[in-house]
Amino acid sequence: MALLDISSGNVRKTIETNPLVIVDFWAPWCGSCKMLGPVLEEVESEVGSGVVIGKLNVDDDQDLAVEFNVASIPTLIVFKDGKEVDRSIGFVDKSKILTLIQKNA
């Protein structure tokens, strides 16, 4: 399964209808974001259907970056039952992402 593309058209539905969602705020020109992408894909393949992991391109949806107070990328925001419960700024490794999931599951 591929990472979900998140945009203004589906962000609300995604975070409100899934119990645990991680949104990666990224941009195609961001080096750290490019490094984080494959790590997120690996995490997603390990955790299965219990967690939705999606990517939101801040260049395409600048208003959402502002709404969610994203000032630096990459930023991972963890939503549980529709509410933000955690966030991580900058590149993080697989173990940190798995810890975010376990802590908030």
Curated annotation (Swiss-Prot):
Disulfide bonds join 30-33. GO terms for molecular function: protein-disulfide reductase activity. Keywords: Disulfide bond, Electron transport, Redox-active center, Transport. Transmembrane segments: none annotated. Pfam families: Thioredoxin. Belongs to the thioredoxin family. This is Thioredoxin. It comes from Treponema pallidum (strain Nichols). The lineage of its organism: Bacteria, Pseudomonadati, Spirochaetota, Spirochaetia, Spirochaetales.
